[in-house]
């Protein structure tokens, strides 16, 4: 039949609004047998006042209740089916009475019977889905719930408790345990590594231990992500610190260390030499003298062209530019032949930067310039050049009587000193490209920065012809040498005449296009398994693929930046035939390519009989000046 006493909260629920906000069961509560607590129950009653709140009371084995175990939270009787009720879990079972506020006139009552909670060592926040129905609905108390709305309900309880002005004391919120919440997981922070990659280190950003790192992959420069070479002492110390950090596992300290990363980072090249901020490098006296000797152009070559010597980069500036990009070559010497990187022009950046850094003043090749003359950014930048510097480069040299020549040394004007800030901007733009600009615009910005830094200058073809003549004197017969010189005398004056009619801006724009074309040929060479190479009209090879290097038996680095020439890999009689064919179609607009046969050789082989007979075709690229 059930208990008929009105004081039994299990079988009789008072009407809404007839009991105080805090209900304390008496000691004579039914269900007590032999001093044992009654079955834990949860009584939910709907109130009529807008300011009434839910009161959750915990009872120990004795009927005494303590105020610090009370917790209030707002709720709505109509939303009980979707709300979550918060309980303060303690060591012993409890009876919970909940007073539910309502904004309508309906009186809803519900009684939820729950099983006894098992004792736990620490207090935890438990949640339970309640169901608001008319009558009695038994619900089982879960042992593990979710923490999704725990903090929100507690905050709402505090605000509702202040509005109602009730005198109930709420217990302080208990910190949730991640282990108790099966479906909750805090966001995983990026852990700081001891040694960041070169680009994260320059940007002072947090890097990870993967190579390529996540940040470089998002910026589309994953193929360039690598660590800078370090000294053995620093490497050993960083490895020791890394192992210690893994054992300790202090993520907070690691985050603070990442925030306090020093702003100034010393860049070191592959040889371990420190590069100063101004781009200077400490060199022994022998290296200094060697560089000074190599940077002085030939006076006869300058007089033959009728031009003054171009501005020269000091050995400190040149070596600073070379060493900062040396790590790019040591990291991926043959990266251009990897299929995933064919479509990205910046995977060839290291080779592009190193090209023409050794070139001092003179003339250079010209090809089709469409797409460069239409760029207003480059034109405006070059139009703002110092007029004095341009006139000093274009006019022939006129020695004065008051200043006699001493040791025939060539000195550039003081106005042509390269700006350190412009050079630093170029290095950062080249090594760490960023932004969402199209590849064409990024390449224009890169070329503009290289020009502003004074590192983009015309190619000296006079040195190329002198190199060819020197090779023929040492390795070829007199008859073959005379035939080649006869062909050179036919087209070389025409090239010289047309080059002298061009302005300095036109010459630099042509050189920009040439370096852009080299990057295009890199993608073409990488996409086909056919030996191929690209050389200037004087014969210096500036690009080649690995198939070509394997064919003639040289490393791939030899087919870059003019280290090898076409006359060094072709046998003597076939070389004479090549120059005759080239002289015939050099200024003939009707002919562009020619298919012929030749015999290649290894430039390092002493036996000329070991030739490689093959059939090849060469294509001539011409510019707007028909060169």
Swiss-Prot record:
InterPro entries: PAS_13, Zinc_cluster_trans_reg, Zn2-C6_fun-type_DNA-bd_sf, Zn2Cys6_DnaBD. Residues 225-251 have a biased composition (Basic and acidic residues). Coiled coil: none annotated. Residues 394-403 have a biased composition (Low complexity). PROSITE patterns: ZN2_CY6_FUNGAL_1, ZN2_CY6_FUNGAL_2. Residues 162-171, 286-305, 404-416 have a biased composition (Polar residues). It holds the Pfam family Zn_clus. Keywords: DNA-binding, Metal-binding, Nucleus, Transcription, Transcription regulation, Zinc. Transmembrane segments: none annotated. This is Zinc cluster transcription factor acuM. It is found in: Nucleus.
